[in-house]
Every structure is written in structure tokens, then in C-alpha cells.
Amino acid sequence: VQSALDDISLEIARGEFCVITGASGAGKTTLLKLIFREDVPSSGQILVNGRNVSLIPRGKIPFLRRTIGVVFQDFRLIERKTIFENVAFLPRILGLDHGRQKRVAFEALRRVGLSHRMASFPSQLSGGEKQRVAIARALINEPEILIADEPTGNLDQDLSLEIVRLFLDIHLRGTTVLFATHDRVLIESVGHRVLTLAHGRLVEDRPSRRAPAPALEGSAAVSGSAEGQLSGDLA
């Protein structure tokens, strides 16, 4: 059986912006799933802030995911709910009182420039606006790590660059960002570290062209190694 990832070993520092690239099927999505514990490696380990996420009991996985925001290519918005309701959904599930739900949802939408569209429905938004809502939803818990899996795949070049600038702004606030894309224009515009995967292997680790940021205490580090066929669906 062909491995989804084979002999991957890397470390991502606190507060780092890291681009993960490679052709379709190279292993980008698989690597990201390992980090937020949607999959587990058949061998090796994934450490987030020094903790082996593969050993986290099923009932504790939601606590890990409260520290990790995830943005997908397909937005995953609830069409029958307003933008505000989409973003406030997680705080409601977590049991925040109504006033707190409103405050954190408004702040998340404000950060992505959509506080004026709170009453709109997803069908009334452009693709770029929908992705901004998805980013706001991922930011709702002030995550230490923000994972983006091909977040611009359905957008044109101008909108894609706009979304990249938003991720760069989020990174400047101290968030560790893992950004998967195969778009070379976006990769060069970011200028940060680039990990290139091919056939499940790490074939290049290009350092950032930007000046290093100061050490950060409030963000998260990711390190580890993984190989072999992945098993489990713990979403």
C-alpha cells in the first residue's frame, strides 16, 4: 500500500508563517490533517506545543481544536444562516452567553472587513467574501495556530492575493500560520518559509526571505515526523 506521507520530519516555530506546496496528491492536506488530529500517523509522532496529538484521547480532541483554526477551500458555510450566525455558531456551542457570542463574532468579522455584512446570507456574498467569513469563523477562538488548506483555490488571482494579505496580517499578530497552496504567484508574494512535498516526501525546505520575527510566547510550535499509511477519521 502506498503511503500518504513517507519519512516526513520537520519543525515549525512559534509565530512562523509556513507555506506548504506541491502538486495535487503530494500530501499537503494529509500533513495538515495530522496537525489538527483529523488523522493519525501509522508511525512517528506529531507534537503541538510539545504534546503528542496522536495520544490525545478522543474526548479531549475538541480541546486541542480550540487552539487551532482551520480554513478550507470550500468555505463550508451554513447557507440557511446569516454571516453573523455562521461565525457565532461555535461560541454558542461552547456555551458562551449571548452577549459574549455577539461580541466575539462581531470582532472576528471586523478583523476580516465584513462587520457591515453580518445580516447577509452566504448566497449574497462573493467568493472572496465567503472565504473571509470562513477565516473569521476560524479566528473566533483566537487560535494559536491557523491552518489554511488551499483557501484560494476557488478564487481569481486578485481575490487570492487579497486573502493572502489577510493571512499575513493575522500572522503579524503572533499567530502561527500554515498555508497550503500550489499557486506559485501566491508563494512568491508571501516570501516566508516554503515546504515542498512530492509523492508524500519533503523534497525542499526553503527558508523565509523576510527578516525573522521576534520570539513569541503566545503562539504555538509544531514539530514531529510521520510516515506510513494513515488511519482513522476523527473529525
Please give the residue ranges for each predicted region.
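ABC ATPase NBD coupling module
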Residues: Q2, V53-G69, I170-L172
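Helix-to-loop junction immediately C-terminal to a conserved catalytic motif
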Residues: F36
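Conserved ABC transporter NBD signature motif
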Residues: G44-N52
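Short coil-to-helix segment of the ABC ATPase nucleotide-binding domain corresponding to the Q-loop/switch region
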Residues: K81-F89
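Conserved ABC ATPase signature
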Residues: F121-L125, E129-Q131
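Conserved catalytic motifs of ABC-family nucleotide-binding domains
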Residues: E142
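Catalytic Walker B motif of ABC-type/P-loop ATPase nucleotide-binding domains
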Residues: L146-D149
